[in-house]
A protein has these predicted regions:
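Conserved beta-strand position immediately N-terminal to the Walker
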Residues: 170
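N-terminal, intrinsically disordered, highly charged
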Residues: 1-154, 164-165, 173-175
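Conserved glycine(s) of the Walker
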Residues: 179
């Protein structure tokens, strides 16, 4: 999978200092699962996912992406690959790799197609092993001004005239985490 999706750059965070973060990143890069971890995050971002869930069963690790509020299952990994991927992700977030039962929270960064993302990772022991939830959020909003939306001039003028009205009600909607 990691050869079929655009590459990501994983950035270690969560340690007390940059030197320890760099040490954690170097240690994680030694694992063959480092490319798998990057690949699953890249796959999620390619599908426009904002969250990624990795869930252990006895024989495999299930993978789901949250795309616009809908969970989408993708091909699972075998348990050995999934466990190694968990270790990589925990290492770059400065969490205890050996602790598979307690709830742990950490953070790491990702660069994908030139865009930087902040990621939070939560791991929790479950009956069949461990569940990892990763939330992926862009460092800065994709749209800062109405012009950034790509709205045609005529539509923008109509929208502005509605906003300028003295009475009325306008409902805005956005994907979670986007305003």
């Amino acid at each position: 999978l990691h050869e079929m999706v655009p590459p990501v750059t994983l950035l270690a965070k969560g340690a007390d200092d940059d030197q320890q973060d760099q040490g954690n990143l170097l240690a994680a890069k030694q694992s063959p699962a480092f490319l798998v971890a990057g690949g699953v995050i890249s796959h999620c971002l390619t599908k426009r996912g904002s969250r990624l869930m990795l869930d252990c069963t006895q024989a495999a690790v299930g993978v789901k992406f949250d795309v616009d509020g809908v969970w989408m299952a993708v091909d699972p990994y075998d348990r050995q690959t999934g466990d190694a991927m968990f270790a990589v992700l925990k290492k770059i977030t400065n969490l205890n790799v050996q602790d598979r039962k307690s709830r742990q929270d950490g953070k790491f960064g990702v660069t994908f197609k030139g865009v930087k993302f902040n990621c939070t990772l939560t791991s929790q022991g479950v009956k069949t092993g461990e569940r990892v939830m990763i939330t992926i959020a862009p460092k800065k909003p994709r749209f800062e001004k109405i012009l950034d939306l790509g709205m045609r001039e005529k539509v923008r003028e109509q929208f502005k005239s509605l906003i300028d009205e003295d009475k009325g009600f306008i409902l805005f909607s956005a994907a979670p985490g986007n305003g």
